[in-house]
Amino acid sequence: MLSKKLAIDHIPHLIKGKRVLMRVDFNVPIKEGKIKDLTRIQGALPSINYCLENGAESVVLMSHLGRPDGQRVEKHSLKPVLPAIEDLLKKKVQFLDDCVGSEVERECKSASKGKVILLENLRFHLAEEGKGVINGEKVKATKEDIAAFRKSLTSLGELYVNDGFGTAHRAHSSMVGVNVDTRAAGFLLKKELQYFSKILETPERPLTVVMGGAKVADKIQLIMKLLELADELIIGGGMAFTFNKVLDGSNIGKSLFDQEGAKIVPDIIKKAKERGVKIHLPVDAVAADKFEESAATQLVDLKTGAIPDGWMGLDIGPKTIEQNSRVILRAKTVFWNGPQGVFEMAPFSKGSLSMLDDIIKATQTGATSVAGGGDTVSLLGKVKGTTDKFSHVSTGGGASLELLQGKQLPGVVALSDRQ
């Protein structure tokens, strides 16, 4: 049970005078030495500040950045992140150019008076992920190297805080290998667990799930699991055309068709019927003659008409928007994963933007709304001022989807249980 795990605000009395080792997610986009999006760094601030306010001797921050595959790659150094952390924390932060080893251990052990230290990229070492690539060859870290790496990390703190939800589904050394007595979730991780446990364990009903994206096959496990939880399921985006073709035999022109996913559609419909879940598919679509913003478009009624050969469906139409709106506005819990159309192009963004508006309206009238998945989160990022109108926007694409599929997250399992 997610709610049984120890969190940082359960242990203020244990923080005083302790060296805190904190796993954060500073995997931020950097271009020409400049950070393009500060969201992840800002997200870690409440946990860092809480430790400092409660008298931590020091806070040592560790993170990965990019995929250096177990080698030191300068463009993946965390050093460019330092000025942003100092600016946001309004205090000096010491940067160490490694994350383990005798020199790092010495610096971290002697840090005092609320000092904050940022370690170099964890993934510069093979032992963080347990594998990597050297000279184009895939290599694995030895058991001895992994044990030594974890021992060195463990010595850097007396208390461990995990605030890196984005990699909690990976059994990496910084997630599962820090062997101290007290291992707690930071505020960011706690919030993620709170909202996902609400969906998984105690949802207010009706619970409506909105699925989008391209392929059915990619999300089959997720859809099957969500059919055990949901009352209503809205299917949109590219994957909807696979459902339309299989179920109605409709001509979908050059729209996305997922050959593998098509084989699974009857199983999804069967399970939905067994569980009494209402599935809502598009009844009309905006079709285009090419995959471009300047394409010619036409509205197609999917019940009576067909998408012409050579044309492709790139968004849901007004009748579907209306249908979805009714479903969303009666929901008490909404989980949104995947846009309704090609929202990056203005002529095909209406379906996704209407969905966004409806979920915000539902939230304002008391529903719990959770958004997850890269495309959905980037849509919210594009439309200013929408993120904070959701109950929760998840920071962990893969981690949140694995959690919803009923899988255990190694980074969460490794946390101490509440007494």
Curated annotation (Swiss-Prot):
Q: What's the catalysed reaction?
A: (2R)-3-phosphoglycerate + ATP = (2R)-3-phospho-glyceroyl phosphate + ADP
> Which UniProt key words apply to this protein?
ATP-binding, Glycolysis, Kinase, Magnesium, Metal-binding, Nucleotide-binding, Transferase
Please give the pathway this protein is involved in: Carbohydrate degradation; glycolysis; pyruvate from D-glyceraldehyde 3-phosphate: step 2/5
**Sites where the protein binds ADP:** 213, 237, 343
Q: Which residues bind ATP?
A: 214, 219, 238, 313, 344, 375-376
Q: Which GO terms describe its molecular function?
A: ADP binding; ATP binding; metal ion binding; phosphoglycerate kinase activity
Give any Gene Ontology cellular component.
Answer: cytosol
List ligand-binding residues for (2R)-3-phosphoglycerate.
24-27, 40, 63-64, 66-67, 122-123, 169-170
Q: Where does AMP bind?
A: 214-215, 219, 238, 313, 344
Coiled-coil residues? none
> Which cofactors does this protein require?
Mg(2+)
Q: Where does CDP bind?
A: 213, 218, 237, 338, 343
Q: What class of enzyme is it?
A: transferase
Q: Tell me the residue numbers annotated for binding Mg(2+).
A: 214, 217-218, 375
How would you summarize the oligomeric state and partners of this protein?
Monomer.
Name the chain's protein. Phosphoglycerate kinase
From which source organism is this entry? Sterkiella nova (Ciliate)
Q: Which gene encodes it?
A: PGK
